[in-house]
Regions:
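Short, solvent-exposed loop/turn segments enriched in Ser/Thr/Gly
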Residues: 7-16, 28-29, 73
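Short acidic, flexible loop segments centered on an aromatic residue
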Residues: 26-53, 92-93
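Short, ordered beta-strand-loop transition motifs
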Residues: 6-11, 49-57
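Boundary/junction segments of secreted and surface-exposed precursor proteins
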Residues: 1-5
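Asparagine-centered strand-capping/turn motif at beta-strand->loop junctions
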Residues: 19-23
Length: 100
């Protein structure tokens, strides 16, 4: 799953994760979880922040609709700390990985 830091200031950064629907049906509900050692996620755009901090859970926002088969969706988050590659990625209950 592609990840990149899009903004960085002293003690604060914003990251972007691109979610791709690799199934043959629209994806109307999803959950992304990951750990972020050395950072505290505080806000999210493009999803609902269920659990903040260094152990993060983000769910789809019902108002954004579904992701079509083969389609992508961007989730952006703001965090305090030092940016790095998040770990322990799980999407829809399955292990995934982040790529820079």
């Amino acid at each position: 799953m592609p990840y990149r830091t899009v903004q960085q200031d002293q003690g604060y950064f914003e990251g972007v994760v691109t979610v791709t629907n690799r199934t043959s049906v629209p994806l109307s509900a999803w959950q992304l979880s990951f750990s972020y050692p050395g950072a505290q996620v505080r806000m999210v755009w493009g999803g609902v922040l269920v659990q903040a901090g260094s152990q993060v859970i983000i769910r789809n926002d019902p108002l954004t609709g579904s992701i079509p088969p083969g389609g992508t969706f961007v989730v952006k988050f703001g965090a305090g700390g030092v940016p790095s590659l998040p770990r322990g990625c799980r999407f829809g209950g399955r292990e995934c990985g982040f790529t820079p």
